[in-house]
């Protein structure tokens, strides 16, 4: 239950029609639009190593970039049944979003980047044991650190203004990095403590020290604000295309892992959801939830196809949209140059774009699930710490400086005897940050040259 590109590559369907929007663009390039309807296929025929007769269920896309994952987001959250104006967003790297105004649905994808998942952040990591996932205010800021069961527990209590650890917590000494939700909390804390001014952290060393050597700096906050800015510009653009004001939008649905675990109040404060939204619903991994529903009841595919056919969607390609371009330029000026929100609104008003209001009051937050995967089944969850595979290889020209090892945020990489590169595949599959490759001073490290070993 993935996005159109994922499912198309998986099924062997050409993806060139996804690169361009509109019939004219396709016609000019001789591109044929592909059908991505629901279907039941042979799992063996698509290359899966399973027994003959095993069936593969593929849910439908709606159109263009609006894939099965976006349909799941709308279907499982209750978004489609909502009578009031409402917005739903999957808070991940691609930030799929949809705005419902009556029977009309406006969709887009903001390509927020990896900061939402803890990547491109110096101490960033994916959610796992030892990750700082939140900061909770209790007169000082308490770091929330994920334990071995991925449950947030109290870490150290920090005074960012005085730049001291006020008190050690039960998770002292166990923090290894910070997740995307932790970064959002840190950005909110920096703003609350008036430490983020004109695009810089106003601390003695330009860093916000959390615990156990984990920190975020001005560059990290700027990266996070770019991701936040992309999402805010996306939401803003959908409202402008729909012709409604922020004051007419109150209901927000948050999906995805980050949408489940992030503090929704802090998220609204920093701009991850519209400031007018005072009724917030947090859901889990809606794609996995819908996939589970299909496995339990394969006939659901027919219902989902009917829903997909009936959605009147207006898809906005943000990459070529003038409204998005105008708003995102202001977002970049805010995070890179410290431009004031007054100037932000003034610049947008000059081209007829409505004002971005300030958040008012405390929103009502409905946490619909406690985990992004709410149903763990009869056997519960078990974290497999060794999956038995590694990536290994030698790089011609490697000088053994171990810079790649030092830069790996997941502690997945080691430089062994003879400068052999060893990567634990349980921690890294080479699809996220590429810090190892970028950090190589001789530019000889190539992740793709590593070979899988058992």
Positions of predicted regions on the chain:
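Acidic, glycine/GT-rich loop-and beta-edge segments that sit at the periphery of enzyme/chaperone cores
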Residues: 41-69, 293-397, 407
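Gly/charged contiguous loops adjacent to phosphate- or pyrophosphate-bearing nucleotide/cofactor binding elements
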Residues: 178-227
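Nucleotide/phosphate-binding catalytic cleft detector across ATP-hydrolyzing
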Residues: 1-87, 103-104, 215-228, 332, ...
């Amino acid at each position: 239950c993935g996005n159109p590109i994922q499912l198309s590559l998986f099924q062997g369907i050409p993806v060139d029609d996804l690169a361009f929007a509109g019939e004219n663009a396709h016609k000019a390039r001789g591109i044929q639009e592909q059908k991505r309807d629901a279907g039941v296929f042979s799992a063996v025929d698509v290359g899966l190593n399973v027994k003959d007769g095993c069936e593969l269920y593929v849910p439908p896309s709606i159109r263009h970039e609006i894939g099965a994952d976006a349909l799941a987001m709308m279907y499982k959250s209750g978004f489609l049944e909502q009578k009031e104006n409402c917005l739903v967003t999957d808070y991940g790297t691609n930030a799929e979003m949809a705005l419902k105004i009556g029977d009309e649905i406006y969709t887009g994808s903001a390509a927020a980047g990896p900061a939402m998942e803890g990547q491109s952040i110096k101490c960033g990591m994916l959610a796992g044991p030892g990750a700082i996932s939140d900061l909770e205010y209790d007169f000082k800021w308490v770091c929330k650190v994920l334990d071995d069961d991925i449950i947030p527990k109290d870490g150290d209590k920090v005074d960012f203004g005085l730049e001291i650890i006020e008190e050690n917590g039960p998770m002292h000494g166990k923090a290894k990095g910070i997740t995307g939700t932790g970064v959002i909390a840190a950005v909110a804390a920096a703003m609350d403590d008036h430490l983020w001014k004109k695009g810089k952290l106003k601390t003695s060393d330009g860093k916000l020290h959390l615990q156990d050597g984990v920190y975020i700096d001005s560059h990290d906050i700027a990266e996070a604000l770019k991701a936040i800015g992309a999402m805010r510009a996306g939401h803003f653009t959908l409202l402008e295309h729909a012709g409604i004001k922020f004051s007419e939008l109150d209901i927000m649905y948050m999906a995805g892992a980050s949408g489940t675990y992030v503090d929704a109040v802090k998220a609204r404060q920093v701009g991850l959801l519209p400031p007018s939204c005072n009724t917030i619903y947090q859901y889990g991994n809606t794609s996995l939830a819908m996939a589970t529903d299909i496995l339990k009841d394969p006939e659901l595919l027919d219902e989902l196809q009917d829903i997909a056919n009936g959605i009147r969607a207006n898809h906005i390609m943000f990459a070529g949209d003038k409204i998005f371009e105008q708003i995102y330029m202001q977002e970049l000026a805010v995070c890179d140059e410290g431009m004031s929100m007054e100037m932000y609104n003034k610049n947008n008003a000059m081209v007829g774009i409505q004002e971005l209001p300030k958040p008012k009051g405390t929103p009502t937050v409905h946490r619909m699930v406690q985990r992004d995967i709410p149903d763990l089944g009869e056997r519960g969850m078990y974290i497999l710490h060794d999956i038995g595979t590694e990536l290994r290889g030698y790089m011609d020209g490697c000088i053994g400086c171990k810079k790649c090892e030092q830069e790996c945020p997941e502690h997945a990489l080691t430089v062994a005897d003879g400068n052999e590169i060893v990567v634990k595949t349980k921690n890294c599959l080479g699809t996220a940050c590429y810090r190892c490759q970028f950090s190589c001073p001789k530019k000889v490290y190539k992740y793709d040259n590593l070979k899988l070993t058992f």
